[in-house]
Amino acid sequence: MKKFLKVWSVLTIICMTVVVFGGALVTKTGSADGCGNSWPLCNGQLVRLTDVTPEKLIEFMHRMTTGISSIFVIVLAICAWIYMKNRRETKPLAIIAVLFLIIQALMGMAAVVWGQNPYIMALHFGISIICYASIVLLALMIFEVDRKFDARNLVMGTKLRINIYALTIYTYLAVYTGALVRHEKASMAVPVWPFENGHFIMPTSVQDYVQYFHRLAAFILIVWLLYVTWLVFRDYRRYRVLTFSMVLSLVFIALQAVTGALSVYTGVNLYIALAHSLIITMLFALLCYLCLLASRSKSNRLRIK
């Protein structure tokens, strides 16, 4: 059973990665209306080879991969619930994975049938990364990563725990601003990075405000991550799981900043934009794992005593 769970969890992560990619691809290519206003089929029927368009194919493939991924997520949640029922995080994570998967699908359906509001659709990506993070956490528990890094003896102080919780919430909000940039079509509102023509110019449109706000949010996120990394290396250097996680988070945020800048300089190159979406998804999952470790800190302290 354990071997099956390991293989299935990896396959589920791969499937959900494809879904995240697919959703970003739909947005980047403007394929959201590729299947008309019917759901789950395209214009009420399966796609026929005689009337295939790139937009229709992208949208239909996204719907199909979402459906396949739903099966993987539900099976993983049920099996983890049964096999790891003694782990206190298992049931909440399984519920979150399935619940947010359903919410994600319903939001996608609503956008197709009743139209797309950019502020609501920006939440669609946020919902998907919560589902993704919960699946990654289940997989890490299945692979017993805690034992390999001796995370069961990890004890965090209040200051670090609060920073990790707050940073994760803030990262989610920063992700929302990035999704809003896409859905408000503000990617090229300020065509030079970090400011317009190298100088700060007062925004004059909604798109300008959205773009500037996202860049400010990203800058704060980078500074905050650097601060938390400094805290970890100052006070918790002996815990490999923390030092490794923070170094990895800095790698992710550096790649995120680079792909963000390149997205502007390349006129939103499709592959760079997709990488930009995937990197922040992985960073958020990593921060959620740190939240999981932080939530265990008190019980670890009592157990060690």
Curated annotation (Swiss-Prot):
InterPro entries: COX15/CtaA_fam, COX15/CtaA_HemeA_synthase, HemeA_Synthase_type1. One of its GO terms (molecular function) is oxidoreductase activity, acting on NAD(P)H, heme protein as acceptor. Pfam families: COX15-CtaA (PF02628). The keyword Membrane applies. Residues 1-6, 85-92, 144-160, 234-240, 293-305 are cytoplasmic. It catalyses: Fe(II)-heme o + 2 A + H2O = Fe(II)-heme a + 2 AH2. It is a multi-pass membrane protein. One of its GO terms (biological process) is heme A biosynthetic process. Its cofactor is heme b. Residues 28-63, 114-122, 182-212, 262-271 are extracellular. Heme o binds at H62, H124. The chain crosses the membrane at residues 7-27, 64-84, 93-113, 123-143, 161-181, 213-233, 241-261, 272-292. Keywords: Cell membrane, Disulfide bond, Heme biosynthesis, Iron, Membrane, Metal-binding, Oxidoreductase, Transmembrane, Transmembrane helix. The active site is at E59. Interacts with CtaB. Catalyzes the conversion of heme O to heme A by two successive hydroxylations of the methyl group at C8. The first hydroxylation forms heme I, the second hydroxylation results in an unstable dihydroxymethyl group, which spontaneously dehydrates, resulting in the formyl group of heme A. This is Heme A synthase. It comes from Listeria monocytogenes serotype 4a (strain HCC23).
